[in-house]
Amino acid sequence: MRAYLLGKVLFPSFPTRLCARQVSDEKSCMQFSIQRSTLPSAESHPEEKLYRRLDVTTWLRHLNQNGQVEEEYKLRKAIFFGGIDPSIRGEVWPFLLHYYSYDSTSQEREAWRLQKRTHYHDVQQRRLSMSPEEHSDFWRKVQFTVDKDVVRTDRSNQFFRGDNNPNVEIMRRILLNYAVFNPDMGYCQGMSDLVAPLLTEIQDESDTFWCFVGLMENTIFISSPRDDDMERQLMYLRELLRLMLPDFHQHLMALGEDGLQLLFCHRWILLCFKREFPDTDALRMWEACWAHYQTDYFHLFLCVAIIVLYGEDVTDQQLATDQMLLHFSNLSMHMNGELVLRKARSLLYQFRLLPRIPCSLHDLCKLCGPGMWDSRYIPAVECSGEHPDSRCCPYGGTSTPLPSSPAPSCSPSRGAKSRDIFTFRKQS
């Protein structure tokens, strides 16, 4: 995972001052503080606070007499805004993680569980029946790292606390079996941080395994540390920052390639904010992302929200790349998760108000299906002009070219042409 965890390992506590150079002169130190403990209602999503946490009573209202989920879209919307009561997470999460289909009956789900439990045991048997040569290779590539990770994952959690805790061994088996089930992915450092909360809430080995499979295979929220996956996420995030926080993006541009790598947020994406917020807040963020309400990329709006709320010092003091990494690393466990969630929902709402979006962000709404712009004006796509392998925009984007940088267009323009439309409108 390169040095993604460097800030967390080296700087576990939040300092009151960050020094630009290791010198004794007090004037060489820059002062920092955590601000924005509240969010004005004018900056909130208009439907904020209209939804309560999904409790058992509300959940049962969404189930018909056969146990099928009715009004799935409304359910996901309620989860997006209100979250899920911890007492029913083990029942609801399998739906969000594509283990159960929403239209399955209670009887069908029980039969499915039995079928998948048999499949899981078959996967485990494949691992246990490896030849000595296969096992040696597996130990070197997978098991050695898994064994190191599981013993230090969430050990403060009562569910995993103590020596010889059987739940730690269950987590270990799930991770080893997943590496056999999906050898192309294998095991990546940090997966234990994702499995641990699933096992804590679901508390069944086979069900947890298949929910983890759904998490890894069916949600864009998860990004492996492999370069192509990570770079795609970072490209979208850079474009969102350019659109919504132009001053911060300009600062990144001034820092050059190092700044544009966005090293400070790699851990956010790889570990799904689990190292940045207490479990209570992090799991609420997971649920909001899993709800897939209006976008499959809500985690990127969470990233932008963190920068909006806690990144002002970066531009005010013109922090260098390493200082920026230190600044955001030291915010770990000191940020207001509920505030970040509310701001992210507001950012998504304002993104949907744009009549034109750059083609670089076209895929942010490509897979979400109904909901991103349901019953609303569908925005026109503006070509960024950055398609070296094509004379025309592959997304059919139009452009309002600047004299110095003409961009090709392949279809008539729709919607407003003003480039000012990309200035993020602030609510006040």
Where are these regions (language model features)?
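Extended, Lys/Glu/Leu-rich amphipathic alpha-helical scaffolds
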Residues: 40-41, 45-53, 132, 207-265, ...
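Secondary-structure capping and boundary motifs in well-ordered enzyme cores
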Residues: 84, 142, 163, 167, ...
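Active-site-adjacent structural elements in folded domains
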Residues: 136, 157-164, 175-182, 195, ...
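N-terminal transition regions in large eukaryotic proteins
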Residues: 1-182, 199-202, 313-314, 365-428
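Hydrophobic core segments within long, regular secondary-structure runs in both alpha-
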Residues: 76, 117, 147, 168-175, ...
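Eukaryotic basic, amphipathic alpha-helical target segments in cytosolic regions
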Residues: 67, 83, 96, 100-104, ...
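Short sequence/structural elements of tandem HEAT/ARM alpha-solenoid repeats
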Residues: 109, 166-169, 189-190, 210-211, ...
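Contiguous, well-ordered alpha-helical segments that form the cores/surfaces of helical PPI scaffolds
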Residues: 172-180, 192-200, 210-217, 239, ...
